[in-house]
């Protein structure tokens, strides 16, 4: 990006986002040609799944509070289709989103799936009501949850199945042991974990081959730095959720302010800068910014072309 202030349209043009749409599975994304999302580069999940390093988190496609049907079902499916058109080939979801609704939407929008599309889902959280996110790591629940996800997604095997969170009432070894059985049965290709600290990750890796970790991480919350370091050292993928949000526990508010100033000077939006910061932070990063808007999706994907230099990263802090 140049030092001058750019319009939103110029940013999108620079990233190649303002292009004619293509049919899912038949355009550049499916053929392996350059796409807006591919400008972020690629990484490999589990040594055999190569994806563009800018994915899509589908959580926001369902109703308010991540509950129930989307306000506009066709609009939600349009976002998924546009993501694939732009070269996004990693989509993350969970059975808790809706619950179940999100996985159904993905299948409705994209099945039969284009070649090379990797779908990751999660199990281990149940939603008895809008307000509740209860953990259930019982082996029998995880087996039923995985098999239900397979049906909703219309898959024979889930590329990446992630334990959504540790259930404190169930030994971690029991939860992941059942997921390992599902993997041996061919229902899961690779196993990931979510909301794990470094010690928990070490325990998990004694039970099953973990290829990814999905934790909260952004410019102002780096509480998972120790986990990220393990991912970098051992070739695991780190999937950061909540790339923009702030909370009282965040310890790097000054860095967020610095990144906001950087974004303004470069003529990019703060969400684009936040995504670009994650991409620059570590080669293990696979950001999955989510939205229910095609316009916001295009803006997020354009961040794949935004570069932050090493010197600028040091200045941001």
Question: Where are the regions a protein language model picked out?
Answer:
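Conserved beta-strand positions in the central sheet of alpha/beta enzyme cores
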Residues: 55, 90-92, 159-162, 192, ...
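Non-cysteine beta-strand/loop elements that form the S-adenosyl-L-methionine
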Residues: 57, 118-122, 239-242
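N-terminal binding-site loop/beta-alpha segment at the start of enzyme catalytic domains
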Residues: 2-117
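Short, acidic/polar
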Residues: 70-82, 138-151
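CE4/NodB-like, metal-dependent polysaccharide N-deacetylase domain
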Residues: 141-162, 182-185
